[in-house]
Structures are given as C-alpha cells and as structure tokens.
Regions:
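Structural/interface elements that position substrates and couple domains in central-metabolism enzymes
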Residues: 1-236
Length: 236
C-alpha cells in the first residue's frame, strides 16, 4: 500500500477508534456516576488529545470510516498480521446501538408493543443526506418490529430513507419535526442536526411520556429536567 493511501486509511481508522474508545468509556461512566461531558472536557484540554471526536453517542457511520477500517483489517489479514485494535473498534461500534436500545427497554420494561416513538435524524451525520451505514437506520430496523409505530423526521433525507426502509410497514415519515410527535410516547434523537438544538419545550411535554432519548448527547439534561422532561443520554 503506498504511504499516501495508508495515511488516509490510518487517519480515518484512528478517528473511528477514538469514537469507539469514548463510547466504551461511556459504559464505565454510567456505572460510576461519572459524566461524559466533564470527561470530554478533561480529556480535550490535553493538547496531545484535543476535543474533537470525543462525544459519546450511537457510534460512527457513513462511507469513509467503516470502509477504511475494513481496508486496514483486510490488509492485516492478507499480510498475516494479528488483528487487534481495529477489530475491537468495529465490535464496539456495532454494540453501541444495543447499549442505547437497552435504555429504551429499561424505561418501558421491554413492553413496547403499544408504543409510538418519534425518531429525529436519519443521516449518519448532520448536514448530509448520506444514509450509508447510518446508525439511525439500524436502530429503526431493530426497533420497528417491537413497537406499534415509528414516526420519522429528517430535514433533508426523508425521500431516500423511504426507499431504504420500504419493507417496514409500521413507520411514517413527516415533513415537520413537531408533527412527527403525533400520538408519540417519546423522542429518540439519532442525528444532531442544528435545528434540533433549539427545541420547543411545550411541544416536548406533549409527548405522552415526556421523555427524550438523546443518542448524540447534545441536549442539556439539566435544562430539560427543569422543564419536567425526562432526559436519557449516554454516560451522563
């Protein structure tokens, strides 16, 4: 592999590993009453580490990170080298969704058959319509068979998601994020679009259970709690 190509693979694989490391750290934080926001600040203040890609969440997706990690793993295999860190990076990333879903199961004691959830954000990251390896789609495919309905909203990629999810019958797409609260019990956020930063708390309280599952840890737990809205994040 030429140095230029290996450098590109390595850069993306390193960032993917950084994300998986932080997500695994979030499991420790939850067991020890630590707070990932404070941990991120502490780690990020070290100039050797920096503050980027230190957000606990649902894991990485898109085309570049998964593809480049896989390329390095393939190279290791072909060269007869031991597969270690990169293999764990993928494993942790895959398991992070289950870690998040367990929060929903715990809240509802696994009794989801009559529940309607609103999902905000479908793309793998904000400001794109790219659904490749989007964690939101994996979440929908796992959750849909267990619930009454999923109400879906994304600022720009509803149409593409309709094609991707065409075989799932108990989902409904909305063009307005608040109309997606129709008869909904809870909000699940999968992508941190900027338009989700400023939320109408009165609308949130209209959710049957007034609960938000924040898969990207970008809302303020204390503010939502003061507004009588239950907040469930990752490692906070």
């Amino acid at each position: 592999i030429p140095s230029s190509k290996l450098s590109k693979y390595a850069a993306n694989a390193f960032l993917a590993t950084k994300i998986s490391f932080v997500n695994e750290l979030s499991h420790i934080a939850e067991k020890t009453d630590a707070n990932m926001h404070e941990i991120r600040y502490g780690m990020g203040s070290d100039p050797r580490i920096g503050g980027q890609f230190l957000y606990a969440g649902l894991g990485y997706g898109g085309s570049c990170f998964p593809k480049d990690v896989a390329a390095l793993l393939s190279a290791q295999k072909q060269l007869g080298l031991r597969q270690g860190i990169l293999k764990e990076t993928i494993r942790v990333n895959q398991l992070q969704l289950d870690f998040f879903l367990k929060k929903i199961y715990k809240k509802y004691k696994k009794n989801l058959s009559n529940k309607i959830f609103t999902i905000w954000g479908l793309s793998f990251k904000p400001d794109t319509d790219d659904l490749r390896e989007a964690v939101a789609l994996r979440l929908i495919k796992k959750l849909a068979p267990q619930v009454k309905r999923l109400n879906l909203y994304d600022p720009i990629c509803n149409k593409l998601a309709e094609i991707e999810l065409k075989d799932i019958k108990n989902i409904k797409f909305y063009q307005d994020k608040y109309k997606a609260f129709n008869k909904s019990d809870a909000l699940v956020i999968c992508t941190e679009w900027k338009e989700f930063w400023n939320i109408d708390y009165d609308r949130l309280r209209c959710l049957n259970d007034s609960v938000v599952f924040d898969g990207r840890n970008f809302l303020d737990k204390d503010v939502l709690n003061k507004e009588q809205i239950e907040y469930i994040g990752i490692g906070i």
